[in-house]
Curated annotation (Swiss-Prot):
UniProt protein name: Methionine--tRNA ligase
This protein's UniProt keywords: Aminoacyl-tRNA synthetase, ATP-binding, Cytoplasm, Ligase, Metal-binding, Nucleotide-binding, Protein biosynthesis, Zinc
Cofactor: Zn(2+)
Function: Is required not only for elongation of protein synthesis but also for the initiation of all mRNA translation through initiator tRNA(fMet) aminoacylation.
Organism the protein comes from: Rubrobacter xylanophilus (strain DSM 9941 / JCM 11954 / NBRC 16129 / PRD-1)
Taxonomic path: Bacteria, Bacillati, Actinomycetota, Rubrobacteria, Rubrobacterales
PANTHER family per the UniProt record, alphabetical: METHIONINE--TRNA LIGASE, METHIONINE--TRNA LIGASE, CYTOPLASMIC
Enzyme Commission numbers on file: 6.1.1.10
GO term, biological process aspect, one: methionyl-tRNA aminoacylation
One function term, GO molecular function aspect: methionine-tRNA ligase activity
Gene name of the record: metG
Motif ('KMSKS' region): 355-359
UniProt-annotated binding residues for ATP: T358
Amino acid sequence: MLCLGAMSERSERYLVTSALPYANGPLHVGHMVGAYLPADIFVRYLRMRGEDVVYVCGTDEHGVPITLTAEREGKSPREVVDYWYAHMKETFARFSISFDNFSRTSTPLHAQNTQLFYRKLKEGGYISEAESKQMYSPTEGRFLPDRYVEGTCPVCGYKEARGDQCDNCGSWYEAYELIEPHSKITGGPVEVRTTTHLYLDLPKFAGRLKDWISSQRHWREPVKNFIISMIEGGLERRPITRDISWGVPVPEPGFEDKRFYVWFDAPIGYVSSTQEWAERTGEPDRWREYWQDPGTRLIHFIGKDNTVFHTTMWPAMLMGVAEDGEEPYILPYDVPANEFMNLEVPVEGERRAVQMSTSRNLAVWLHEALDRFPADPLRFYLASTLPETGDVVFSWREFQSRVNSDLIGNLGNYINRVLSFTERYFGGTLERPSRLPAAAQEAFEDFRALEESYGRKMLDERPREAFAELLALGRRANRFFDAAAPWKTRKEDPERARADLYACCALLGSIAYHASPYVPEAMERLQGFFEGPVERITDLKPPGAYRSAGARPLFSRVEDEAVARAEEQLSRALLGR
């Protein structure tokens, strides 16, 4: 039976979140490396250590991206989000993302929470009302969000510029600055009108935000310095309502036809999802331990485009709702923000690195990748290329190389030959020797050093760096097996061969322990034919025996034909075919 060894020391309680994905389209590999796979690896490691950890997420189901999709497809927003919620939940499960709760922002509970946050912020004096200019469509009889407006860019003259940014020159502007603006939906003319909205008075939090961020000594310095510089440059009020019909209603007279801005209600979804989890476990008030106990570490895994929001606006909201005598909310302990993933696409004999484009179908959609390959090899490759310090490139060719050489040739090869050799020549049982050979003791010492480094990097939320230590464990174990040469000693010195293979099984247990956060399905399958502790050498209490029966390879090679088909799909998308 596979038993994951838990470490005896328990330090903190953890609440881990991943950014809420918009429920308006499928997930792709860029999403995974940004906010979901690194969080899942981290959470799985914490669970193995025996830590108290809850991992929540959910779909972001409000805002313009949803309504645009609905109008384009001739559906209601509810139909769109219901479909994509189910699709995403299934895709996450297929990819072995182990949420404790996966919620959605269209639930009654979430609406109540959003309105409660608003009321508390208003009571604290952090909400104000102001007029602003916005585009209005006389034909449709409604105000149009920026993404509903197109026109000619006032900077470069591009004729299909969006209402907030020009895709041609990258310029940002107000929608009413466009030349000859028109509705993206009807093509009809639009005009500037005045509308009234509610605002979060972010400048009132500037001092507290600066002090809090300055105290985060474990944050990356570039991130800290950037946010502090932004605060010192002056924060602006942020609108929290929009002229839109789909979203959380605003509990304010005169605002019946408006809804909360999606940026305001989405992060409250973290709280709602935690409450759902607590309710489901039969302890409805337990969510407070994770949101109001200073002993909890709140960690938000996000993409870098969400950094400013999660380090200024969201913390300000948490600060502002805790001033009416209730227990204050904790603030984020860390906000690991990953960079972006581009694509390597073969076109006309050369390989190009291009940006993903969901509108052009230029992406590696996760559900399609899972139709081609099991989850573990995909997780393994993506873990090796997590964009922790800079943008990265997804390559099907590199995927094949990593899986075949590192996953199979290094880790899988070691596990397979140790267990198959044990079964073939020693009946599948290796009893504990009276003493381990000196070479085994040296390997154990090397493992302890690598295990310590792996654990330190994991707790620093750097799973890509920890991944390198996992591969180093595999290489060190293979060197020990090769040097022990049990194919020779089984004849010349059977007792030495048994002792060496016993040590090999101990190393195997450590490899399986450290591989579990990355390739969980394979390590679960290992329990079908390996009996022995799966834990660090550092914590190992040598068992009376290791046993193996029916060992078989855990992974399959990635063949050239499969890679060629996957690359062809990207090539066609790039060429618009």
